[in-house]
Amino acid sequence: MTKKYVALIFGGNSSEHDVSKRSAQNFYDAILATGKYRITVFAIAQNGYVLDPERSKRILALEDERPIVADYMTTVDQQDPLSRINALRAAGDFDIFFPVVHGNLGEDGTLQGLFKLLNKPYVGAPLRGHAVSFDKVLTKELLTVNNIRNTKYIVVDEKTAKTLTWAQVVKDLGDVVFVKAANQGSSVGVSRAKTADEFEAALTDSFQYDYKVLIEAAVKGPRELEVGVIGNEDPIVSEIGAHHVPNQGDGDAWYDYNNKFVDNSSVQFEIPANLPDAVTAEVKDMALKAYKVLDLRGEARMDFLLDENNVPYLGEPNTLPGFTNMSLFKRLWDYSDIDNVELVDKLIDYGFAEFEKNAQLSYEFVSLGEEKIGKFN
């Protein structure tokens, strides 16, 4: 049997560029370990250019990226906008894309739009699922209208933020809030505020990353939970994992970018999470419901906050969860009796299945006729 040809694409121009490389290394190894696929790699440099497979392999091996990218840029016509993706021609006729681009481009639907334009199967959620889930405000609104419990919130832009007072925030949401850029991942552009000065500083920081900012009520004494979901029409959930960041003396600690990807030595992990059976069932049910409501496919991680009364709140989905050695998503499936090799095989199968299903849809062209649209001269 001819092996399917997988194009693993990683990197990107977001703050999660280096995280993507570490995730891609694990996916690359797992794909090879299946023995079922040929594989090539494409790195997206921080300037947004897709690099050829030879240079991309060197970047995946963690060589210094700067001279590799500088050398590649001497080979392209930078006046041609299509030169940004021209390297995709180098791999020949591969069968499926496997995106491992966290943050911008990879999780906001941009790459998925390109894959659809190229008429190629790809692993993961469709464009609309990524785009909606990456926008924290749209996600909250969809969760709310579908009665999926989440925290209270306020949305502001730069104009409305000028008239919003800290007193009003405290009245509506409480005296501790989280301020988040609407379209960012991995806790980038996220701050906790418990005073007026901290709130103003948090807004300033978040507006560096987006024109729309979400202000969320904090959950008191929370336990942070994560659950993995994979599949298409009939998704399955992993065991639930919990993590706890010890208090540093300034209030409730939280799972920030540094804890996730730089140094998690102080983080206490618990897999599976020690929860009452009813809470376990509710969290898994909420995760599955959100997965379907947000039109997700392939894979996702659902993040929850559990308050001091064991009431779960869905925080946000992650449509392309990290797969580094520090990532809880990766470990959740190990504890769910699905190892890395089986997991990537399933994800690739889901990608092909979704493509084949969508290929059955009708996109009928109906001509208006020359008398309606005229002739081109």
From Swiss-Prot:
What's the record's note on cofactor binding?
Binds 2 magnesium or manganese ions per subunit.
Q: Which InterPro entries match?
A: ATP-grasp, ATP_grasp_subdomain_1, D-Ala_lig_Van_CS, D_ala_D_ala, Dala_Dala_lig_C, Dala_Dala_lig_N, PreATP-grasp_dom_sf
Where Mg(2+) 2 binds, per the record, is at: 316, 318
What GO molecular function annotations does the UniProt record carry, in alphabetical order?
A: ATP binding; D-alanine-D-alanine ligase activity; metal ion binding
Q: Classify the main location.
A: cytoplasm
Sequence ranges assigned to domain ATP-grasp in this UniProt record: 140-349
The listed locations are: Cytoplasm
Residues noted as binding ATP in the record, renumbered to the chain:
170-225
- Indicate yes or no for the key word Transferase: no
Alphabetical UniProt keywords: ATP-binding, Cell shape, Cell wall biogenesis/degradation, Cytoplasm, Ligase, Magnesium, Manganese, Metal-binding, Nucleotide-binding, Peptidoglycan synthesis
Q: Name one GO biological process term.
A: cell wall organization
Please tell me whether the keyword Chaperone is annotated for this protein: no
First-level EC class? ligase
HAMAP family for this protein: Dala_Dala_lig
The job of this chain, per UniProt, is described as:
Cell wall formation.
Concerning its family, UniProt says: Belongs to the D-alanine--D-alanine ligase family.
Protein name (record)? D-alanine--D-alanine ligase
What gene is behind this protein? ddl
